[in-house]
């Protein structure tokens, strides 16, 4: 187990219930969204850090070209959803913690209602509508058909490579209709056989939702397509780790598909861990897929913590 998981409420209890002389652990993703890495640092302080440049120099990992692919779609529906989301969020002072507590904690809900001169019933109704709007907006972003279209375009241009896709849902992964899909609905033996067969292949496509984000070593992967963006640097590092296994002469490619001018841009900004090349048109994407150089541009991101939602 990578040690970043030891900061959870369940696993962190082991620090006080297990007798040990010293702890030695390793992770590529110490930082957590909830800030609980301080627990790990307390019991197992960081004694050494290996930089990416050091790993590349020692040929422990392969270089990766990171592409941010901006998808331009009709945002009429998104703007309507975003307007609803913001109207409900304003009721909770644009504070995620307040909104979630109002939804889940009746004592907090009663207290907050009293503070703002409302009723617990009204506060709960606003919180429920806020959550509904949040999920609707996220669904628009995550499951937009443009992502499937562009994903297929990339896969069709890399038929001679071993590719992996990171999808928001199993249903989304299956709708790509390229290669094979791993998911919890299949028997463990079926998923294992699929990975074994893929390891022995020279090219192909492996689709998954979260099953392959971490803890899996798959041979020969050199192309990744990420379509399940959130604000977590852990997820970004783990998915990149799937394709950067060292092989002589290999340069891997990671394509991150993002709906332009939406909250997904901010999620990408919060989760990004490396330099990237911006692809803001299908013409530029075609050039990249033909191994041509393109001119990239810079984007100013707002990486405020509250923008992770």
Give residue spans per PLM region.
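Conserved Walker B
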Residues: 1-4, 211-212, 228-230, 243
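Post-DEXD/H (motif II) to motif III coupling segment of the RecA-like Helicase ATP-binding lobe
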Residues: 4-66
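Catalytic P-loop NTPase motifs of RecA-like helicase/translocase cores
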Residues: 5-7, 32-33, 215, 233, ...
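Short, Asp-centered acidic motifs that coordinate Mg2+ and/or phosphate
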Residues: 22, 204-205, 223
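Conserved interdomain linker/interface between the two RecA-like ATPase lobes of SF2 helicase motors
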Residues: 46-161
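Long, largely alpha-helical accessory region at the distal end of helicase-like NTP-driven motors
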Residues: 104-108, 113-115, 277-309
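Conserved helicase ATPase core of P-loop NTP-dependent helicases/translocases
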Residues: 162-166, 171-216, 235
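Conserved segment of the helicase C-terminal RecA-like domain
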Residues: 242-272
């Amino acid at each position: 187990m990578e040690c970043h998981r030891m900061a959870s409420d369940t696993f962190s209890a082991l620090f006080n219930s297990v007798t040990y002389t010293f702890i030695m652990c390793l992770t590529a993703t110490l930082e957590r969204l909830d800030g609980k890495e301080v627990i790990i640092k307390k019991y197992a302080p960081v004694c050494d850090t290996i930089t990416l440049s050091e790993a590349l120099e020692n040929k422990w990992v392969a270089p990766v070209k990171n592409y941010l692919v901006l998808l331009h779609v009709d945002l009429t529906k998104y703007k309507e959803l975003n307007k609803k989301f913001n109207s409900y969020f304003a009721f909770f002072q644009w504070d995620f913690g307040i909104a979630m507590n109002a939804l889940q904690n009746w004592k907090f809900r009663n207290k907050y209602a009293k503070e703002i001169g409302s009723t617990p019933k009204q506060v709960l109704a606003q919180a429920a509508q806020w959550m509904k709007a949040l999920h609707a907006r996220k669904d628009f972003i995550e499951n937009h058909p443009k992502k499937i279209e562009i994903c297929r375009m990339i896969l069709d241009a890399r038929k001679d490579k071993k590719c992996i896709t990171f999808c928001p849902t199993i249903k989304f992964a299956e709708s790509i209709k390229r290669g094979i899909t791993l998911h919890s609905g299949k028997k463990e033996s079926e998923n294992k056989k699929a990975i074994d067969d893929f390891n022995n292949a020279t090219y192909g496509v492996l689709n998954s939702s979260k099953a392959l984000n971490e803890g899996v070593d798959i041979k020969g992967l050199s192309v990744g397509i990420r379509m399940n963006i959130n604000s977590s640097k852990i997820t970004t590092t783990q998915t990149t780790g799937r394709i950067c296994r060292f092989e002589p002469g290999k340069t891997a490619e990671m394509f991150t598909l993002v709906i332009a001018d939406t909250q997904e841009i901010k999620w990408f900004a919060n989760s990004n861990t490396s330099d990237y090349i911006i692809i803001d048109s299908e013409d530029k994407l075609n050039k990249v897929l033909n191994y041509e150089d393109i001119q990239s541009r810079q984007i100013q991101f707002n990486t405020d913590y509250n923008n992770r939602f």
